[in-house]
From Swiss-Prot:
Disulfide bonds join 132-278. Keywords: Amino-acid biosynthesis, Branched-chain amino acid biosynthesis, Chloroplast, Disulfide bond, FAD, Flavoprotein, Herbicide resistance, Magnesium, Metal-binding, Plastid, Thiamine pyrophosphate, Transferase, Transit peptide. Its EC number is 2.2.1.6. Acetolactate synthase is the target enzyme for sulfonylurea and imidazolinone herbicides. Its main location: plastid. It comes from Zea mays (Maize). This is Acetolactate synthase 1, chloroplastic.
Length: 638
């Protein structure tokens, strides 16, 4: 067995001598292969996969290696093929170890917030755990918004941070922040690793926690001296999560599912209210709708979980949902709430929401059941298992249960005809809704769509056709501006060959504009679709409606020359060597979008739209369906 010192020397020599071209070719080959499933998951928490042998690692199974290498090998054993990591003093050892990995590719974003949003986009679009890595201090704190976002939107992520050496913890050392304490309330769980021998177990637990039950972010903080310490890893240590595993939801009882189906049989006006918790249940949901004929509305997080072009789709409900979706929920006598949390942007005035309906709430997280709206029947279970169980009961029934909701669906079809989504048109100005409709038409509704936060986000939700789960990526619960570009890039990494479009606003886009560098360097085919109104559009809309149009720092252009488009995103994009075009007239839009989609690699399209446009319909905050606003814009005095 090699000594620790000899192994350390051999390790350093191997790193400096490793041919970069060979490793790059290996990684490219891996990139083309389908990503392996996460082994450290709820389905198979104790099935570690040994990493392949490689000359980059000059040690045998029983030889010591650095803690950082144990960490990277642990990630490999959990099926990780991509990480989003930005180096710094306290994480350098991890980056050195990554250069010795034959299978993990690092995607170098230019800001830790960008890399963490990319990990989120990667996870949202693929269902796999997204991994981001940052240094201590400001590197770690730059992850905070993305961790909070992932917790609210139930995104499986593992964030790994470097930390100052153990002996310096608590001394206010350079770039020291107590990131475990900082993130305690915005992660599902977090760890401070104080023993190098704990790394394999902690990583396995982190992936299991992130991906099981209600998914969420887990943070692992590793001091630098632990990363440098030599040790022989023990890979078969069992996880130590007895309380957590015992509380994981069990398959739903057949008696409860039969009770739900009895309620469906007694109902005349049922509605399915579907959220992000159905992302893994699209097939089961479609089958349930086929068997019952119940109309479906989705939350912002639920877009794509049921095809929005299906005749039984009511599209999105809530503050900026369709009239007919909100009408259906208001008139319903039965509301089947699947994988939702009765968020305030959906319910408005909670007492008035679905006030005529019996409510069935199915969710994997017991904390969500009864938190905002008390259900008549609650099932704490995986929605996928609940739907599978109900489908089996429906398909196996000797009497072949049949439901007739024809008159109810006819009533809703009439609402669709009377109150379709719409907007005012003009000959010259480009309506943002029109631009998205053209994008939808030219991509045939097949693109993965990422967005920032604001008016453009709502228009993208309303006017693009979402046909499958994991097609829509947006910061829903936290509402974090700057999410769109890095999330789209992360989705592009996870889904090579798939068209990915970042529908963004000028305000959101500018918050992480530096990530144009990364998509250019890796030549990711991310199409940046900026709806540029020179304002913080959603805040302007609220100023128009509720503050007598008094502008309070919502203009983002140049006050000394308001006719100028400022900043010039076309010039900025070209500075990153990304082709870019600006369009200002409606008759230019179709050809410009077609060129964007046909151009290989990244592309930016700057679409100038009027700032007076409002997102409609709109239910004011705290309002009810009866308070819905259907017309007007910034050209109107309120």
């Amino acid at each position: 067995m090699a000594t620790a010192a000899a192994a350390s020397t051999a390790l350093t020599g191997a790193t400096t001598a490793a041919p970069k071209a060979r490793r790059r070719a290996h990684l490219l080959a891996t990139r083309r292969a389908l990503a392996a499933p996460i082994r450290c998951s709820a389905a198979s928490p104790a099935m570690p996969m040994a990493p392949p042998a490689t000359p980059l690692r000059p040690w045998g199974p029983t030889d010591p290696r650095k803690g950082a290498d144990i960490l990277v090998e642990s990630l490999e054993r959990c099926g990780v093929r991509d990480v989003f990591a930005y180096p710094g003093g306290a994480s350098m050892e991890i980056h050195q170890a990554l250069t010795r990995s034959p299978v993990i590719a690092n995607h170098l974003f230019r800001h830790e917030q960008g890399e963490a949003f990319a990990a989120s986009g990667y996870a949202r679009s693929s269902g796999r755990v997204g991994v981001c890595i940052a240094t201590s201090g400001p590197g770690a704190t730059n992850l905070v918004s993305a961790l909070a976002d992932a917790l609210l939107d139930s995104v499986p992520m593992v964030a790994i941070t470097g930390q100052v050496p153990r002996r310096m913890i608590g001394t206010d050392a350079f770039q020291e922040t107590p990131i475990v304490e900082v993130t305690r309330s915005i992660t599902k769980h977090n760890y401070l690793v104080l023993d190098v021998d704990d790394i394999p177990r902690v990583v396995q637990e982190a992936f299991f926690l992130a991906s099981s039950g209600r998914p969420g972010p887990v943070l692992v903080d590793i001091p630098k001296d632990i990363q440098q310490q030599m040790a022989v890893p023990v890979w078969d240590k069992p996880m130590s999560l007895p309380g957590y595993i015992a509380r994981l939801p069990k398959p739903p009882a057949t008696e409860l599912l039969e009770q739900v189906l009895r309620l469906v049989g007694e109902s005349r006006r049922p509605v399915l209210y579907v959220g992000g918790g159905c992302a893994a249940s699209g097939e089961e949901l479609r089958r349930f709708v086929e068997l019952t004929g119940i109309p479906v509305t989705t939350t912002l997080m639920g877009l794509g979980n049921f095809p929005s072009d299906d005749p039984l789709s009511l599209r999105m409900l809530g503050m900026h949902g369709t009239v007919y979706a909100n009408y259906a929920v208001d008139k319903a006598d039965l509301l089947l709430a699947l994988g939702v949390r009765f968020d305030d942007r959906v319910t408005g005035k909670i007492e008035a929401f679905a006030s005529r309906a019996k409510i069935v709430h199915v969710d994997i997280d017991p904390a969500e059941i009864g938190k905002n709206k008390q259900p008549h029947v609650s099932i704490c279970a995986d929605v996928k298992l609940a739907l599978q169980g109900m489908n089996a009961l429906l398909e196996g029934s000797t009497s072949k249960k049949s439901f007739d909701f024809g008159s109810w669906n006819d009533e809703l079809d009439q609402q669709k005809r009377e109150f379709p989504l719409g907007y005012k048109t003009s000959n010259e100005e480009i309506q943002p809704q029109y631009a998205i409709q053209v994008l939808d038409e030219l991509t045939k509704g097949e693109a993965i769509i990422g967005t920032g936060v604001g008016q453009h986000q709502m228009w993208a939700a309303q006017y693009y056709t979402y046909k499958r789960p994991r097609q829509w990526l947006s910061s829903a619960g936290l509402g974090a501006m700057g999410f769109g570009l890095p999330a789209a890039a992360g989705a592009s990494v996870a889904n090579p060959g798939v068209t990915v479009v970042d529908i963004d606003g000028d305000g959101s886009f500018l918050m992480n504009v530096q990530e144009l560098a990364m998509i250019r360097i890796e030549n990711l085919p991310v199409k940046v679709f900026v709806l540029n109104n020179q304002h913080l559009g959603m805040v302007v809309q609220w100023e128009d409606r509720f503050y007598k149009a008094n502008r309070a720092h919502t203009y983002l252009g140049n006050p000394e020359n308001e006719s100028e488009i400022y900043p010039d995103f076309v010039t900025i994009a070209k500075g990153f060597n990304i082709p870019a075009v600006r369009v200002t007239k409606k008759n230019e839009v179709r050809a410009a979008i077609k060129k964007m989609l046909e151009t290989p690699g990244p592309y930016l399209l700057d679409i100038i739209v009027p700032h007076q446009e409002h997102v409609l319909p709109m239910i004011p905050s705290g309002g009810a369906f009866k308070d819905m606003i259907l017309d007007g814009d910034g050209r109107t005095v309120y």
